[in-house]
């Protein structure tokens, strides 16, 4: 069986896994929001992604990533997101200082599945914010995360700020 798996190019396997994961979660989110309502969905989704974000600390530690500056924290969360979401995810840093780093997603598998499935509500805002909260708090509690733009809400890109606490 492994020979059959190895006959599929790695990029194709990664794309299929990404589409399967993000597509399934968007479909589940849609069903859950319809069954439980917006408030309960956002409560569940926020808690789910906050806990998931906490794994960023172990990820960064396991591969020896520095986490002492906003840019290092963004790089660690960026790499974890890229590994988790595959080649559809396109992220860039648009600002970086000693106290603040601004990241931007211009292509996102979650947003693509949201469009493909015609989901009519914000499946990402609370989850993205809470994932960022969990990740940044776990990696370095001296910093905060704030989602400032969201493609699902009509922005041209998603954007977030990692900032030193004042």
Model features per residue range: what roles?
Residues 127-132:
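ATP phosphate-binding glycine-rich loop and adjacent ATP-lid/helix-beta elements
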Residues 1-100, 107-126, 137-138, 142-157, ...:
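N-terminal accessory segment detector
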